[in-house]
């Protein structure tokens, strides 16, 4: 997630889809034991209590089957990916191995930087693009790789709302797709204007 390490990857939501009140969060925290009563060292993977599923490989294979990665590789574009020390790093290394990777190492505290791909958190990436001078495009993802930020070759930031608008435009104009556009509550209302 783009949340700080102290969240430990968890986000608790209420019945209305928003965050829980601090009082409810405290009630939940109060029932969590200080120590783990289960000895995880004695649970064997062969015991059938745990099923190992390689979701990363499933995702990589899905992307390879649905995107023309060969065209991207042959395009000659100089691409950069900033994982912000998050979970997207391994999958993208398998999907686009010739991309230049930064912040692609495991660090549970994200080196103290909030792993949210917004301009103020991506100053290092912006400076890298400007200093290199030959970067065509740079992508950054948050801790769990479900939020993105984009830079053009001039080091200009493009936020996720504008990325969505660009994708809708591309799919309608160049791929000739028609139909409904589904968005999340947090998506820019300009998508509706564009889709109408």
Feature-to-residue mapping (PLM):
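Hydrophobic "anchor" residues on beta-strands that sit immediately upstream
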Residues: 78, 138, 180
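Proline/glycine-rich low-complexity loops and linkers
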Residues: 26, 30-60, 154-196
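Generic beta-strand/beta-sheet core signal
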Residues: 82, 102, 140-142, 151-153, ...
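Short Gly/Thr/Asp-enriched flexible loops that form oxyanion-binding sites at enzyme active sites
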Residues: 5-15, 91, 146-165, 191-194
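Short, high-confidence coil segments that cap the C-terminus of an alpha-helix
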Residues: 133-135, 177-178
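Acidic, glycine-rich active-site loops and adjacent beta-strand->loop/helix elements
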Residues: 3, 105-106, 143-146, 185-191
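Gly/Ser/Thr-enriched, mixed-charge loops and adjacent short helices
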Residues: 8-133
């Amino acid at each position: 997630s783009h949340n700080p390490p102290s969240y430990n990857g968890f986000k608790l939501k209420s019945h209305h889809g928003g965050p829980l009140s601090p009082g409810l969060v405290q009630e939940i925290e109060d029932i969590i034991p200080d120590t783990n009563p289960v000895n995880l060292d004695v649970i064997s993977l062969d015991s059938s209590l745990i099923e190992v599923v390689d979701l990363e490989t499933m995702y990589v294979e899905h992307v390879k089957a649905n995107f023309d990665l060969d065209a991207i590789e042959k395009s000659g574009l100089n691409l950069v990916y900033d994982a912000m020390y998050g979970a997207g790093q391994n999958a993208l290394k398998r999907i686009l191995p010739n991309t230049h990777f930064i912040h692609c190492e495991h660090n549970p505290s994200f080196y103290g930087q909030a792993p949210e791909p917004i301009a103020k958190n991506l100053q290092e990436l912006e400076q890298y693009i400007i200093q290199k001078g030959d970067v065509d495009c740079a992508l950054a993802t948050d801790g769990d790789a479900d939020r993105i930020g984009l830079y053009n070759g001039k080091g200009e930031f493009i936020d996720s709302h504008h990325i969505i608008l660009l994708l809708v435009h591309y799919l309608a104009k160049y791929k000739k797709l028609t139909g409904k556009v589904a968005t999340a509550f947090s998506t820019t209302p300009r998508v509706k204007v564009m889709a109408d």
